[in-house]
Amino acid sequence: METKGYHSLPEGLDMERRWGQVSQAVEHSSLGSTERTDENNYMEIVNVSCVSGAIPNNSTQGSSKEKHELLPCLQQDNNRPGILTSDIKTELESKELSATVAESMGLYMDSVRDADYYEQQNQQRSMSPAKIYQNVEQLVKFYKENGHRPSTLSCVNRPLRSFMSDSVSSVNGGVMRAIVKSPIMCHEKSPSVCSPLNMTSSVCSPAGINSVSSTTASFGSFPVHSPITQGTPLTCSPNVENRGSRSHSPAHASNVGSPLSSPLSSMKSSISSPPSHCSVKSPVSSPNNVTPRSSVSSPANINNSRCSVSSPSNTNNRSTLSSPAASTVGSICSPVNNAFSYTASGTSAGSSTSRDVVPSPDTQEKGAQEVPFPKTEEVESAISNGVTGQLNIVQYIKPEPDGAFSSSCLGGNSKINSDSPFSVPIKQESTKHSCSGTSFKGNPTVNPFPFMDGSYFSFMDDKDYYSLSGILGPPVPGFDGTCEGSGFPVGIKQEPDDGSYYPEASIPSSAIVGVNSGGQSFHYRIGAQGTISLSRSARDQSFQHLSSFPPVNTLVESWKSHGDLSSRRSDGYPVLEYIPENVSSSTLRSVSTGSSRPSKICLVCGDEASGCHYGVVTCGSCKVFFKRAVEGQHNYLCAGRNDCIIDKIRRKNCPACRLQKCLQAGMNLGARRSKKLGKLKGIHEEQPQQQPPPPPPPPQSPEEGTTYIAPAKEPSVNTALVPQLSAISRALTPSPAMVLENIEPEVVYAGYDNSKPDTAENLLSTLNRLAGKQMIQVVKWAKVLPGFKNLPLEDQITLIQYSWMCLSSFALSWRSYKHTNSQFLYFAPDLVFNEEKMHQSAMYELCQGMHQISLQFIRLQLTFEEYTIMKVLLLLSTVPKDGLKSQAAFEEMRTNYIKELRKMVTKCPNNSGQSWQRFYQLTKLLDSMHDLVNDLLEFCFYTFRESQALKVEFPAMLVEIISDQLPKVESGNAKPLYFHRK
């Protein structure tokens, strides 16, 4: 066997001649500094290949015999468990194999010497090969002592890591470590130390590279590969922990074609990692999980505390280097996606040499499967003559966009090793599972934060505009007589702001003071110094529509309930309260003294408003005009089509359209204060009544002329706090009358055309269209009526069909009473009947009957609260003779509203001592409505039958109601409910 001995050659010989004889070259890179610490040390890879089928039968030289005697541990023990008797070779073959190993060791020492020669150009310091050889000799002795033991490497009393730390030698002030890491592909029952004779596969010679299922053996701890028949071997690694860069041979080597088919195809590549063509510093990770603290576990599942040898079945540990089969931790699958701060290719003492590595032409011609390698960009400062400088160039590794990306998987929990002097800025995307051997598929983005649509508190949503059952919809729980609940019909879950979206210490001052465009701003009242707005995070933008609700108390209390929010937002300031920005402009204007908000604008003409007049923010001119127009009972007519423009300049051109716009804005002579002001007034009025009278002052002493003042007692919880809280709770709890006031339908316009003649058919058609619009409002009013939704849907429809005419005529009498002082019939702001129009409508007697009801309102001085409760009782005043489906719920609801009317009459200050008499008068008025409604229904049914002959139009809503009501009423199925007997 012919082996190549080690010769002590001078440092200045031509090195290029030697690189042609070595299949793989070892490249070293240096930081250029004379002193280096352990964190910046290089890592030497002892990876000498050997295959049993490539041992030539030649005689060895003297120097190779020397090395052969230093490697007695390479001889295989025949008594070792897991080795078959058929695989036992003769001692001669073992000696030949040892000689081949010695030859490989000689090649390795030549490469080390060459690397030292390049480093000596800058640092003038060298290390004798004898020291390196001495360290290798110590390692061989160590393996000799432990090589013939039946146990695995993990059972060694002294770990290899400690031995390496003792036997490590310094190169140029640094530390050189021999590290080889790769998953083991041996049999599961076989030990980790085996000969190439025990392997199940073989590597072909360079002439036949078609068989690429090569496996290599590890003698002791040294994986040996033949440089002549270099395939893609899998090496068994000693469990040595490295702190620098790592070198891993790819795992599925049996399926991968070797790019190193011929020794001439390697251009300054490392011996240790054949498929990678990288230097000692370049990592070739296997497609399994490589973690920063990786170790190798044994095939026998014997784990050490710090170092172990692992089979593919024992790879679920976070700190193990395992086979590509099983791994659940984030992995780094190829040099493309390396997150351990390793360079992509080997550099020589500071240069950034980048080159595209391609497989051998022989491999491509043989049809072997190619290994996907990272494609690196060329750097202009490539090594040309061996003279290098300091390493200061960062290589950017770009993965291939095609299927080659399947071999690279981005590590989920890999961290940048700060100890490495090289920084590879590679963009990483976290993945949960390893994508080894499969094509990469991006995970679809999931919105963590999903948008939930809220329900608006509005009874103007119509499913079917002309369907009674469609407007009512399915029943929901409602009022049971006590009107419990808040302004929100649905429960809105408020999540606490945990502050995880932004650090408190990193908020700039511009994001604290002022409104930030990134989200909704909340105003904080700080004494009388103005407001400070703090931007909300993006997670609260999905609930911005909550601020459109008129009641803010519930929402504010839910926000205030979180202690972390109040403590974090205050920042030492006395935060009294905070209000959403777009809730009420008047409220914020009263809060902020230094705000530059626009002045109030008249809702009628657009001029500058002087205040709230008759319930609407208007100017003084529109206020006076409305008062004179209503009290003077002027019957204005528009010269156009009731669509004149009313602004500051043209507001006096058409008084009819101006009055129409005033009514449309909501102006009313009997308008009361807003609900909020009423609450505050109720609190202030109840507090003096609940306070005990002050004690009489003590008599004044005439001698001294001084007044003795009794010491003021501190208010206790029982005497002062509880009454105030009870008063506030009573004021904030809406009463049934308050709820009925808020849900009262708005004013509806008839759309009367003044250009047409006032004939009976035109007036009746206009009244029918107006009644259809008003019925839609009535149905939606009943839908939100407290307690009405508790009834079955069939009962709701029946009650509305029986009482629609009664409700319309009663509301007409109220509007005539409030707007015209019961002198005219106020059907709509644009349709008011005087005596002349009553005669023209062909229903003069019926109009007089409705006018009499309006006059009764004047006599009784009916209040709005009484009117709303009486209106509900009229809704519940006519039922079928057979009864309703839920008669008990109907009786309970009607009884509750009768009690509410009794309470309202008792609270009236003008009826002290005469409450029962007034209650009797109001109930008699309700009974009188039945006689009037019977006459109105008879006239309506007649015009409905003769609508084509009379040319009277009926809207779709009235057609539906009358068609269902007409046969029931004419058959006598309707039963009116009276309070008093006739």
From Swiss-Prot:
According to the UniProt record, list the residues that bear Phosphoserine.
Answer: 249, 258, 282, 286, 298
Q: What is known of its domains?
A: Composed of three domains: a modulating N-terminal domain, a DNA-binding domain and a C-terminal ligand-binding domain.
Task: List the protein's name.
Answer: Mineralocorticoid receptor
Give the keywords, sorted. Cytoplasm, DNA-binding, Lipid-binding, Metal-binding, Nucleus, Phosphoprotein, Receptor, Steroid-binding, Transcription, Transcription regulation, Zinc, Zinc-finger
Gene Ontology cellular component terms for the protein in this record: cytoplasm; nucleoplasm
Positions of region (Modulating): 1-601
Its source organism is: Saimiri sciureus
Q: Which InterPro entries match?
A: NHR-like_dom_sf, Nucl_hrmn_rcpt_lig-bd, Nuclear_hormone_rcpt_NR3, Nuclear_hrmn_rcpt, Znf_hrmn_rcpt, Znf_NHR/GATA
Q: Where is this region: Disordered?
A: 230-328, 345-375, 682-708
**What does the entry list as the binding residues for progesterone?**
768, 774, 815, 943
